Regions:
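PAPS-dependent sulfotransferase catalytic core
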Residues: 1-69, 71-78, 103-104, 109-114, 218-269, ...
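A structural signal for well-ordered alpha-helical segments within the folded catalytic domains
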Residues: 30, 34, 95, 99, ...
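Aromatic-acidic/polar surface patches that form glycan- and anion
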Residues: 18, 26-29, 33, 83, ...
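Residues at the C-termini of beta-strands that transition into short coil/loop
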Residues: 29, 53-55, 75-76, 94, ...
């Protein structure tokens, strides 16, 4: 049943949602998240959207889920989830992790190619400078140690580490666990998430929003911040073709093994 204080059309009462049942969208990069965020933000109204869209916007002990908002959406940690009202609706979206890795790579490459020389010299664009200067294999595995940590945190079985630690860059916390232990920890934490949708099943998200909140969103087949290739194109083979060695291809494929097993255990299709 929809919450009685919400409308049955395209919008929802953001004040009521903030007090009773905020929406929490755990946005994993390159999973159609900007499209979903835009639709939900329009539904609840901009002033009811948490300003924290990435974990880096809340340094130190600052909350990533500050109280009083109807929508929490972004590349954020979710360690504070239980501080929100008990009627919250928490969800995330997964896609084939190999396609996510490749999509992320080609998206960053496209962004880097659009920067001028001065912009590429800025510290915050160091990774984009490297993606232009290096082969794909060197980008993923060429170091130095600090950049390797960035690569591992964002590409190496990210679904497992994000769900297991509830943090965008929580992977170091798992260093003493076996792959099986990491997977079990991730699976255990999914009990705190109401729905996990495949990227191919966003129609169910639309239906769930309508049923739960009496409001309508349209996200199926609409993609914001898409990469340079057509949506129906598989990016993974194109990325593998840029990896020169068998060892490099095997190492890159290992970045998706745990996530593929996680999706299989969850019954979420790729």
């Amino acid at each position: 049943m929809p919450i009685s204080s919400l409308t049955s059309q395209a919008s929802a009462n953001g004040t009521a949602l903030a007090a009773q049942s905020p929406i929490v969208f755990l946005h994993i990069p390159k999973t159609a998240g900007q499209t979903i965020h835009n639709a939900l933000a329009a539904m609840v109204g901009g002033r009811h959207v948490s300003p924290i869209r990435t974990h880096t916007q809340a340094p130190g002990d600052a909350p990533q889920m500050p109280a009083g908002y109807a929508l929490y959406s972004g590349h954020i940690d979710w360690t504070e989830l239980e501080t929100l009202p008990g009627g919250r609706f928490t969800f995330t979206v997964l896609r084939d992790p190999r396609e996510r890795i490749a999509s992320f790579y080609f998206f960053l490459l496209k962004e880097a190619e659009a920067l001028d020389r001065d912009a590429l010299e800025r510290p915050e664009n160091h990774g984009k400078k490297l993606i232009l200067q290096r082969s794909a294999e060197e980008y993923f595995f060429g170091g130095p140690a600090g950049f390797n940590a960035f690569i591992r945190d964002h590409y190496d079985n990210f679904y497992v580490s994000y769900l297991a630690t509830r943090k965008m860059r929580g992977r170091p916390e798992l260093r003493d666990l076996t792959a099986a232990q990491r997977l079990e920890k991730a699976l255990a934490n999914t009990s705190h998430i109401d729905r996990i949708y495949p990227i191919s099943g966003l129609g169910q998200l639309e239906a769930d929003i309508a049923a739960r909140f009496g409001a309508q969103i349209s996200v199926t087949g609409t993609y914001v911040n898409a990469g340079p290739m057509a949506r129906e194109q598989s990016r993974w083979p194109k990325l593998l073709n840029r990896i020169a060695t068998d060892r490099g291809r095997a190492d890159l494929e290992a970045f998706a093994e745990g996530d593929l097993e996680l999706m299989e255990r969850l019954g979420v299709s790729t």
